[in-house]
Regions:
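Bacterial N-terminal signal peptides that target proteins for export
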Residues: 1-9
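Bacterial N-terminal signal peptides
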Residues: 8-19
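Active-/binding-site microenvironments in catalytic and ligand-binding cores
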Residues: 24-348
């Protein structure tokens, strides 16, 4: 028995030492190949894999910028834009306008009698919208799972879900992201404008596309997978028929695990509303205990890896730019669960 205990202890030490060496070799602090991340940052952590961002990693990403060209990865949003059925509609309402100010005359300083003889006015709007529309970054509180409705790091919706937003792992905990980015163009690999409805992007697809592009995913990389869907967004995302035809293509559990556990992807995204293919296969659903969004559960809840959605990758695809510095910041609105209507950038 003593011999067995000593053997187990020795193996544990070797495993931890190997993980430590691997982390040092990759520049990662907590990522372990074959495991990924998970709940490894302590019981109060709300940041997840983005804890890996450092001054050195940001500087390394910026060294990829050689031409100064900026690719705007954001999609324009308005009241008619496409929304997943599980998110609210939106409205943009004019609150003040030059014509209204002249008509109302409710503010003395806006009138000629009040000294405004030059006719100065202003526009001001009220925006009512979901925190999950257009180009977005899912926060770690976005998805819960299990009968206890836990989200990342074991936080419970019953304890941290407030009347005025979430109180743990909200969007303000997402740090500004400056990291190496890689775009994997699966649509180009398949030689189609956009992937077909409910197409599952496999590990083999990702590997073949990376080989074709002569680029690789290294630990700490932000990965963006192109399906071709975003080209149908149009001016404001109102071409819903075209969008919905292709929006259900995406990665499955095997591809998600390969990206995170084998390649060390820091964040994973695409040009669709949900990253993963839907509906999932029974096997993928059961992989997380039964779910209609198994990749979301795996990445956000189990791994603490943020999901990037509806990124406009058409410019990168047209120029065949596959490696770049990815830069994104979220709206600092407390209680929200996703950075929404964003304009991330790829710098080359």
């Amino acid at each position: 028995m003593r011999h067995l205990i000593r053997s187990v202890a020795f193996l544990s030490i070797v495993t931890l030492a190997s993980a430590s060496v691997l982390a040092q070799n990759t520049g990662m602090k907590r990522w372990v190949q074959g495991k990924g991340w998970g709940w490894v940052w302590g019981p109060t952590d709300e940041v997840g894999s983005l804890n890996e961002l450092t001054d050195a990693s940001r500087l390394a990403a910026l060294r990829l910028v050689t031409t100064g060209k900026v690719y705007d990865l954001g999609l324009p949003y308005d009241r008619n834009s496409f929304k997943w059925i599980g998110h609210s509609s939106g409205e943009i309402i004019s609150f003040r306008s030059p014509a209204g100010e002249r008509t109302m005359q409710d503010l003395p300083f806006t009138t000629p009698a009040g000294g405004n003889t030059g006719g100065t006015g202003w526009h001001s709007n009220v925006i009512f919208m979901s925190d999950n529309v257009a180009t977005q970054i899912d926060g770690l509180a976005h998805i819960s799972h299990g009968q206890d409705s836990h989200f990342y790091n074991g936080f419970l919706a019953s304890e941290w879900g407030g009347d005025f937003g979430i109180r743990k792992a909200d969007v303000t905990t997402i740090p500004p992201i400056v990291a190496r980015g890689v775009m994997i163009d699966v649509a180009a690999l398949k030689n189609v404008p956009a992937l077909p409805t409910a197409y599952e992007i496999t590990v083999s697809d990702l590997q073949a596309a990376l080989k074709r592009q002569n680029v690789d995913v290294t630990p700490g990389t932000v990965v963006l997978v192109r399906t071709g869907t975003a080209q149908f967004w149009g001016v404001n995302g109102s071409d819903h028929a075209k969008l919905t035809m292709h929006d259900t293509a995406g990665i499955g559990i095997s591809a998600a695990k390969w990206l995170v556990e084998q390649k060390g992807a820091l964040a994973v995204g695409s040009d669709t509303s949900g990253l993963e293919y839907v509906p999932p296969s029974p096997a993928d659903s059961k992989a997380v205990g039964g779910s209609f969004n198994p990749v979301h559960v795996y990445l956000l809840v189990e791994q603490g890896v943020h999901i990037l959605e509806f990124h406009n990758l058409e410019g990168l695809a047209a120029d065949r730019v596959y490696e770049f510095a990815y830069v994104a910041t979220t709206n600092a609105i407390r209680g929200t669960v996703a950075g929404t209507a964003l304009r991330p950038m790829a710098l080359r």
